[in-house]
């Protein structure tokens, strides 16, 4: 497996990954291309045999950063890929001068919540009815560098 930075040239592959991971809420190829072209929007992806099997992206707004997306193909989960992607994304955020990270996750997504908690994120709130298809609350998480458990 290979971990590398994502570029706008990866937008089509990431759109396919989005569709597999987030049916009904997937980012389009055009949205991904725009995001990957924007300044201070790092993204990392994991490839296995040339196939993109996971990615993480966000936006740095120093001194803070927001994790936008973390996606791993269902058949590739529970192999440490999410952990590797999040670690790489956090390093890129830190390189932009960020030391406080935020994210939202579906309240029912126990595996993702466990991943974020393992990485030192703390639940700090709830956004009611944040998600659609299906409608669901978002759990808000925060991590401050130097304060990890």
Region roles according to the model:
Residues 45, 66, 71, 80, ...:
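Conserved beta-strand segments that form the floor/walls of ligand-binding pockets within enzyme
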Residues 23, 126-127:
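Glycine-rich, flexible loop/turn motifs
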Residues 1-3:
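Extreme N-terminal starter segment of soluble prokaryotic enzymes
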Residues 25, 66, 76, 113, ...:
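Enrichment for repetitive, rod-forming helical segments
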Residues 51, 73-87, 94-96, 100-101, ...:
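Conserved glycine-rich acetyl-CoA-binding loop
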Residues 43-44, 99-102, 106-113, 119, ...:
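C-terminal "cap" of GNAT-fold acetyltransferases
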Residues 5-75, 83-96, 144-148:
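Acetyl-CoA-dependent GNAT
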């Amino acid at each position: 497996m290979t971990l590398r930075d994502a570029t706008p040239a990866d937008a089509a592959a990431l759109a396919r990954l989005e569709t597999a991971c987030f049916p009904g809420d997937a980012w389009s190829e055009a949205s991904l291309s725009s995001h990957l072209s924007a300044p201070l929007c790092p993204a990392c992806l994991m490839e296995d045999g040339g196939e993109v099997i996971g990615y993480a992206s966000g936006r740095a707004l120093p001194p803070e950063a927001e994790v936008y997306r973390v996606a791993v193909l269902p058949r590739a989960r529970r192999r440490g890929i999410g952990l590797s992607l999040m670690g790489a994304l956090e390093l890129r955020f830190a390189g932009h001068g960020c030391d406080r990270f935020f994210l939202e996750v579906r309240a029912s997504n126990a595996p993702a919540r466990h991943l974020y908690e393992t990485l030192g994120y703390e639940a700090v709130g709830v956004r009611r009815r944040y998600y659609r298809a299906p409608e669901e609350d978002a759990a808000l998480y925060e991590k401050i560098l130097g304060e990890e458990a």
